[in-house]
Design a protein with these regions (language model features):
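Residues lining hydrophobic/aromatic ligand-binding pockets adjacent to catalytic sites
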Residues: 1-150
Length: 150
């Protein structure tokens, strides 16, 4: 059975983030943010991809698996049940289903993939819903990585 990891960088530095990825044996980071930019240094798309490449890891942005704006607003307000409801509806869209198939193909090809988003707590993040949806497409074991806080 393939394994897929998840990680949130909310409380991490680039160093502790990459250490957690290395400890988890990650080879490719799949960015599941709708908008791959960040106020946290080193976590916007181009810089993140460069940091990962320096560490010997690949990067792919799966934008259509990102949370719609209304889901991000619900998450910021701590309305996690609403976020889950909005995101499940989003997962039913053709674009999200296609991106999920792309993710399944990547995971099925063999590299250890890690789903990336901001939220530190996987139970409050849509990446857990992505992992669950992936498990409906291909058999995967899900492991949540937790970078050290700094």
């Amino acid at each position: 059975m393939a394994a897929v990891a998840t990680i949130g960088y909310q409380l991490a530095t680039v160093r502790t983030f990459i250490e957690a990825l290395n400890a988890g044996g990650v080879e490719v980071v799949a960015d599941v943010r709708a908008v791959a930019s960040s106020r946290r240094p080193g976590f916007s798309k181009s810089r993140l991809a460069a940091n990962l490449a320096e560490a010997g890891m690949g990067y792919v942005h799966l934008r259509d698996l990102g949370t719609p704006a209304e889901g991000r607003a619900a998450a910021r307000a701590g309305r996690h049940a609403e976020l889950r409801r909005i995101y499940r509806r989003h997962l039913a869209t053709p674009a999200a289903r296609e991106e999920l198939r792309r993710l399944a193909d990547l995971v099925g090809a063999g590299p250890r993939v890690c789903l990336l988003c901001l939220e530190a707590d996987p139970t409050h993040c849509h990446r857990t819903l992505v992992a669950s949806a992936l498990a409906e497409v291909i058999p995967v074991e899900v492991v949540h990585l937790h970078p050290a806080e700094e």
